[in-house]
Amino acid sequence: AGFYGSAAWAAGRRKEQRILVLGDSLSAEYGLARGTGWVALLETRLQREKIAATVVNASVSGDTTPGGRSRLQVLLHKHQPTLVGIELGGNDALRGLPLANTRDNLAWMVEQSQATGARVLLVGMQMPPNYGADYARRFAALFEAVAKERKIPLVPFLLQGIADGPDPAALFQPDGIHPRAEAHPRMLDNV
């Protein structure tokens, strides 16, 4: 039910897709050569499969849900997407923003996207254990709650198989936060 599946389904109905990805550094190719991040790989995969789709990567390194919320209306109007992917929230947690605010911002962005007729995919994140088990659980649960309430698909953890894989250090840049280019095909498979 992710981007690829939705675009392939629509292609069968002969409708060109306009995919908007609103994310943070994990989607903005932070520290990578241009064209090697999962969003660029999505567009390449769709083209290879001859699925008519335009992918707009509106991701900004360091972005938070308040930042995404402030930019969303202009992006929806400008690009008129048929599919919207929201990959935000990780920086909210890293900055200590209240979880309730993150949840409310995500819900608002989903609602606004749905109001245009776009299908929405919510891309979740998880916090490392040093944030505490209770905080990590509540953080992951906010994505689940928004997806359930708005009846949209959820990718529970964009970095599944990367951050929790057998050798995560090998797949991350020296900062330990941003995946290397080698991890981005797996990230695409996750969405």
Segments predicted by a language model, with ranges:
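N-terminal signal peptide c-region/cleavage motif recognized by signal peptidases
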Residues: 5-7
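Serine-esterase "nucleophile elbow" of acetyl-processing enzymes
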Residues: 9-61, 71-80
